[in-house]
Amino acid sequence: GAPASAAQAPLATKLAVHRRFLADCASGASLGELLAPLSELLHDPGAPQLTFALWVTLFPRAWAQLRTEEQEALVKPLISLLSKEWHVRQASASPNVVQGWLQALLACKPMPKIPAAVLQYLGKTFNAWHLAIPMLEHHALLYPNEPQWYDALSALRTALGERDSFCSLWSRRATHPETRLALALEQYGAWTAAQQAYVDCMTRWQAGETVLVNTPRAELQLWEYGVLRSAKKLNQWELLSEFAKQTQQPQLLMECSWKTSAWDLLKDLFYKYSLPDVPGIKMLQTYAAIHEGKLSEAEARCNDGIQFALQEWCGLPPLGVQSHTPLLQMFQQFQELQESAQMLMELNNAQRVGSVPDLSSILNTWRERLPNTWEELPAWNDLISWRNHMFSHINNVLGRLAEVPRHAEAKPGLASLGYQEMVWTVVRFAHVARRHALPEACINIIAKLQSVSTGIAAVDLNDTFSKMREQVRSCLQMPGLVPHGMQMLSQADIDQLSKPQQAELFQLKAELLLTESAEAADNGTAEAEAATAHLATAISMHGALPKAWLLWGGWCDRTFRKGGDVVWADRALGCYMQAILLRLDRARSMIPRVLALLAAAGQ
């Protein structure tokens, strides 16, 4: 006890001295003496957070002391102050003056009514998304009949990439159930159906239907943008190009021009229109410069584009949002443009000295650096379109080099190297389109590839199997094209394929026949029997084909359910177990059914 008391005595003495010091300051100091050090701290460049916090605390309290008419009189000067151009110089700083003003206004009660367009501009320009959006939501609740609040909210949500919030906002705001249906289809990724729904709305409105004739202008624009957005997702660039020409949208026409290889049109658009300094335009200018072989100009445009993209990145919220994804994809495209310029230099040097360039490092990197499977189709299309352009250029140069006998003997596949890379990449693109439940886009992608590869020996390309598999699987997703898939497989020359590939084609035939059997009015007995024959052929050719085992097991299981013959239960059990042993993910979901079949076989 004594040591503790001894230790507490000095502490009590120090606290008493400090208490007397504070009392002397409070009794003898004037207001000026208190404000002087505070003013010095507030003007310290190293303490912006203190200034920001003090302003946000004091201004709402001062605002609350004003009378209603005084508050209303101050709104117009506030709007004028927030709209001053000199604030832009501080846009990249955090915190900045505009953020301080908006956070203080957000805490005011009642909140001043700042116009929606001003809040939208301030939120986007000064990285004040988290302040502008709550203010817009507050005013939208107070003034539900004023559409400008919803327009600004929609614009900010779209800029942040929050498609679900955008669709939710419009679902509450839309005046027609047809609009809500189109938005729901879009949210679920059913882009073909969503596009058709938007087109139907526009067609009915143009026809003057009474239900849609009084549609608000904002909703009409939503339909139009919905059609364009769906067309981009579905890779319909020819359609978008025609629309851009008719509606005089130069930036959309520029985007379509390079993707459809209309380089002359793209160059004319650059000279015809005044272009903003945004990363997307700089990327298009880099594409055009590399296409024309102007590598120095391409490097300058690319560097400018990267700087503008970094500025946009700094203008986004610090937390990860969906709008970061397009910028990351843009950085990858700029990286590949730099690598494209490097490849052009190597190809030019190879033509000058007559040697074979070594492009394997960059080409292997491109194979490994594809977008993720779940990324949206436009991100894939941007990369694949440019890569295909480079592959065509590579093939033209290597084709000329392959005419030299010593090069042709050293590298027999030199002339078709560009086509091999193109085919592999485009087939991968088609596969992703099919996985996104966009079979029409998959078929169109393969069709364009076939037009490019006409006249190239299939043995050099080694793409027959991959293209056919993607086309047939797309037909499986579109029941109306099942006969087309059967015709394609029947006409295929499979002798050059390996045994596992031949077995998989027989399995695909069985899948098509089972699909026909399920839709047939007479239960499709003939198609089902033919399907089992093809499955037996596939398994006899290549036993390690788990999906064939699963399909066969499913057919045996359905036969057992219909007739009750335990023999079919035994066969289904064996097929399911074999598929599980071959580690097919889908087969694991059949384990409960396997247990049920074991019980049935035991009885």
Which residues does each PLM region occupy?
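Long alpha-helical scaffold regions
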Residues: 1-170, 174-603
